[in-house]
């Protein structure tokens, strides 16, 4: 079997259609075409074509995952979950079910994102702590829980929380300023603040400082 034509895709000129014996077989990124030595006239057996089809799937999935990472910083666990969903079989409108992607392929995408420094749990956690509900207010306990749920190592969480300039006293004042009108009753407001992860003594002090004595 022989590669008989290469052509840029209309919707994505950076991706190249590869034709084998006059029939479309798969698409590859321009970078993959160069790295894999793909050219018209190249003769390949079925086993090699199957390998190249996996490379095609890898290139497509990597671009999707990269675009996902560029939307905002993500943790490794978030992207692993994203890739898992992308790799599952899908039911087409025709009723046909697509084959899922092998776990080795999604792991390879994840490893490349880490190697290219598009994924870094430390920098993600630092960004999360600096920006999460900055105006609305959030307890450090809630931030700790959120980071743990996103797969961040406990040592990283401890280090960054110790270095953070955010503190519960300031965060409480932010929330009280926004929620006091909704919870005019002091006890109800205290229960709400406790549900957000603040401890009782800090809540009492914050309400006293805020002259919320109803």
Language-model segments: which ranges?
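An alpha-helical, amphipathic repeat domain used for nucleic-acid recognition
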Residues: 1-214
């Amino acid at each position: 079997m022989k590669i008989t034509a290469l052509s840029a895709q209309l919707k994505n000129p950076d991706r190249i259609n590869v034709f084998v014996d006059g029939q479309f077989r798969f698409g590859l990124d321009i970078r993959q075409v160069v790295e894999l030595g793909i050219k018209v006239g190249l003769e390949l057996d079925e086993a090699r074509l199957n390998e190249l089809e996996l490379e095609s799937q890898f290139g497509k999935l990597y671009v999707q995952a990269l675009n996902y990472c560029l939307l905002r910083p993500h943790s490794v666990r978030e992207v692993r979950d994203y890739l898992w969903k992308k790799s599952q079989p899908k039911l087409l409108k025709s009723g046909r079910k697509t084959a899922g992607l092998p776990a080795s392929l999604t792991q390879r995408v994840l490893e490349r994102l880490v190697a290219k420094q598009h994924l870094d749990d430390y920098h993600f956690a630092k960004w999360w702590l600096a920006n999460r509900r900055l105006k609305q207010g959030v307890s450090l306990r809630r931030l700790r829980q959120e980071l743990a749920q996103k797969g961040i190592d406990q040592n990283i969480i401890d280090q960054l929380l110790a270095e953070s300039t955010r503190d519960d006293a300031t965060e409480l004042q932010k929330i009280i300023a926004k929620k006091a009108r909704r919870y005019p009753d002091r006890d109800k407001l205290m229960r709400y603040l406790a549900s957000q992860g603040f401890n009782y003594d800090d809540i009492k002090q914050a309400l006293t400082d805020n002259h919320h004595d109803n």
